Amino acid sequence: MALIFAVFFKKIVIDRQIEKLNDLEDEVEKAKLKAKEIVEEAERDAVSKAKEIELKAKEKAYQIKEEIEKEARNSKNEIAQKEARIIKKEEILDGKIEKIEIKSLELEKINDELEEKRKEIDDLRVKQEEELSRVSELTKADAREILLRKVREEMTHDMAITIREFENKLDEEKEKISQKILSTAIGKAAADYVADATVSVINLPNDEMKGRIIGREGRNIRTIEALTGVDVIIDDTPEAVVLSCFDGVKREVARLTIEKLITDGRIHPGKIEEIVNKCKKDIEKEIVAAGEEALIELSIPTMHPEIIKTLGRLKYRTSYGQNVLTHSIEVAKIASTMAAEIGANVELAKRGGLLHDIGKVLVNEIETSHAIVGGEFIKKFGEKQDVINAVMAHHNEVEFETVEAILVQAADAVSASRPGARRETLTAYIKRLENLEEIANSFEGVESSYAIQAGRELRIVINPDKVSDDEATLMSREVAKKIEDTMQYPGQIKVTILRETRAVEYAK
């Protein structure tokens, strides 16, 4: 029994050991599987990371490639631009070289021609010396003197022709330059302008106001006329009073006086005198303000107060219907612009242009030229000699001392002669046209004449059988001279001679 039990127990122990062995084998198998899985997973990770690294490397390589290609393109463009500039410069240089070569060839040709001419002259001189010595039996010295005299005469003739050609070219260039300067000056000095009249019209609230202005037995109107120096015209024109006076200051004082009397309602000699005195003071202030505004407009820094005051009075003065202050400002602008174009003193030209007609305010007090009076007036108040000369010389009454004085005269002519700047009365205008045509018709060979362009051009039709082309040129000068001697007119008048020759034949 005990043996059986021992055998049984041993078997049990052996079975358990076999089971443990089997369990160990299972665990080993599992460990092998686990190890295999770990190895496979590690291999997968390695492959994945390798692919990732490869992808990043490819991306980096692509970026580097793009940057290199971009830099290459930029470099290529820069090189292309530089090549284009170089090609353009080469073309310009080629063109200049070609011009230089052409000029060189021309110079060589001219030198060759001159050399040929010298040879011809030398040959001719030798022949003439021989001929003169042979024919007249003159000495060599006498023959040489005759030959030199003849050559000198021929050269003088050639020089005269050359000088005339250069003079014509110079005249053309001067014309172009002067047109450019004048067009620039007029363009910069363009200004609005309204022609002034010698009468003022005051509108009345009703016709009853006419009686109040006239006053009992005309005392009010006589007081106004006596205090202001203005003719007060009251006629059948409804609700209107006309003031007539060539002195713009007096006319403006009278206008303001009557307007204030109408507004106030009290119209009697005492009130009229009070308002006239007040209006005169107001006008004096406006005169000074007008002078100061002119200086500001032209950027002129300062002047003597008396000059400014006298300058302001030009606002109320006209010449051929043109406001003198407006004209003076325009002349200053044109003169300064022309001075800037030719490199002269701009400030001097501007100052002289503004003051050139200041003497027109003073000519009623002193019987002499307004240019001389104006020059002496500004000299009294410290203006420089160059400005004084510009004022006094603008009508050729004294000699020009500076180029700016000449510019002031030219600017004055431009401002006065431009279309629309000045006007005349209808009667004087018609009479001037008639006189122009009468002067033209007084010459022999004139068939008809027409004053056109508001009297600024005179066209004359002549008989071609009686007047030749050369005589027509001479006639135009004679007509212009006669107009200058016998007529007074603003600006200039163009004289045009028309000569037409017709040949007519009939086919039968």
UniProtKB/Swiss-Prot annotation:
Keywords: Endonuclease, Hydrolase, Nuclease, RNA-binding. Coiled coil: none annotated. The keyword Nucleotide-binding does not apply. Transmembrane segments: none annotated. Residues 324-417 form the HD domain. Signal peptide: none annotated. GO terms for biological process: mRNA catabolic process. One of its GO terms (molecular function) is RNA binding. It comes from the Bacteria. SMART domains: HDc, KH. It holds the Pfam family RNase_Y_N. InterPro entries: HD/PDEase_dom (IPR003607), HD_domain (IPR006674), HDIG_dom (IPR006675), KH_dom (IPR004087), KH_dom_type_1 (IPR004088), KH_dom_type_1_sf (IPR036612), Ribonuclease_Y (IPR017705), RNase_Y_N (IPR022711). Residues 198-264 form the KH domain. Its EC number is 3.1.-.-. The keyword Glycoprotein does not apply. CDD domains: HDc, KH-I_RNaseY. One of its GO terms (cellular component) is plasma membrane. It is an enzyme of class 3 (hydrolase). Belongs to the RNase Y family. Endoribonuclease that initiates mRNA decay. NCBIfam families: HDIG, RNase_Y. This is Ribonuclease Y. The gene is rny.
